[in-house]
A protein has these predicted regions:
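Secondary-structure junction motif
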Residues: 157, 191-218, 235, 278-286, ...
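Beta-alpha-beta core module
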Residues: 163-173, 177, 228-277
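A short LG(V/I)-centered, amphipathic sequence patch enriched
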Residues: 21, 43-62
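A late-sequence structural motif
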Residues: 187-189, 237, 257-301
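Hydrophobic hinge/microswitch elements
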Residues: 137-142, 147-150, 157, 201-257
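Short helix-boundary/capping micro-motifs
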Residues: 13-31
Length: 301
């Protein structure tokens, strides 16, 4: 099997992202026939059909999706290789860290914990350019984005079991947070209120506890965002059971009540690839994450 060249990897990524040869060609400044020829060449080299062609465009096959994942990760390593080598050659004396840093995180962490981290990070390393995307913690979540080569580091919920959420990644816990009952302030019986819930709320870390609570009713309102759930509770539409990070910056008129001596908890940490874990931008971000002063209700682990 012949090796794929970097330009071929870029073509595979573009075709997968644009879901078609014509759009990929326009993005890359190439002709459609050149892109089609390059994809056929990649398929011959790899011995697999990478894209299903049709009127719908070009959709990655299972083999193609795997190839594109490797392509993204290899291209990212090529991108960071120059700065890493130059830093090593200079003895890293200046501590200069430059270039893009791709971060994915779920909403509450991105909104409340990342800003001070990135403020310190960019103050120390002005040449660093963080790029932050919000990813819902459903399915493979932030870890899947890292595994697929779309992000350098993800801030994710980590189960109480040791293995990372996606095989092949490095996963490190940063803190543990408890869940609490949030309800309108002054309500005499908040546990009797209707339940407002959101679909990222119940992972394996809460499911067992939730199942043992006979006082929790079925959800009256289901939403897709924890901030919407908090807003609905603030308007008197019910109560919610939420992790502490989701309650940071909550509006006035809310009360937060503990769930007993052994409330459900979850771990939050970072995931990255073994290859990127040692790069200067990722190391710099991890240092700032570890130095973050945690709000009340979050305990470092």
């Amino acid at each position: 099997m012949s090796d794929l060249a970097p330009h071929e990897l870029r073509i595979l990524v573009a075709v997968e992202q644009e879901q078609g040869f014509t759009a990929a060609a326009a993005r890359l400044g190439m002709t459609q026939s050149a892109v089609s020829h390059a994809v056929r060449s990649c398929e011959r080299k790899l011995g697999a059909v990478l894209f299903d062609r049709g009127r719908h465009g070009a959709r990655a096959t299972d083999a193609g999706a795997r190839a594109v994942t490797y392509a993204r990760r290899i291209l990212r390593l090529l991108e960071v290789m120059g700065p890493e080598v130059r830093g090593a050659g200079a003895g890293d004396a200046a501590g200069e860290v430059t270039g893009p840093l791709r971060i994915v995180a779920f909403r509450s962490v991105a909104a409340h914990l990342l800003p001070p981290v990135l403020a310190r990070l960019t103050a120390r390393h002005p040449g660093l350019t963080p790029q932050v995307r919000i990813v819902r913690e459903l399915g493979r979540g932030a870890a899947g984005e890292v595994a697929d080569g779309r992000a350098d580091l993800g801030l994710a919920t980590l189960d109480d079991s040791a293995p990372p959420p996606v095989p092949g990644l490095l996963a490190v816990r940063l803190f543990e947070e408890s869940y609490a009952l949030v309800h309108p302030q002054g309500h005499p019986a908040p546990r009797g209120l209707p339940l407002v819930d959101w679909d990222e709320n119940c992972g394996s870390y809460t499911r067992d506890w939730w199942g043992r609570q006979d006082w929790i009713p079925p959800a009256t309102i289901d939403v897709e965002d924890d901030s919407v759930a908090v807003s609905l509770v603030s308007q008197g539409l019910g109560m919610a059971i939420m992790p502490r990070t989701a309650l940071l910056g909550a509006p006035d008129g809310l009360a937060v009540t503990g769930l007993g001596p052994r409330p459900p908890t979850r771990f939050v940490g970072y995931v990255t690839t073994p290859e990127l874990a040692g790069t200067a931008p990722v190391r710099a971000l991890i240092r700032e994450l570890r130095a973050l002063a945690l709000p009340e209700g979050l305990e470092r682990v």
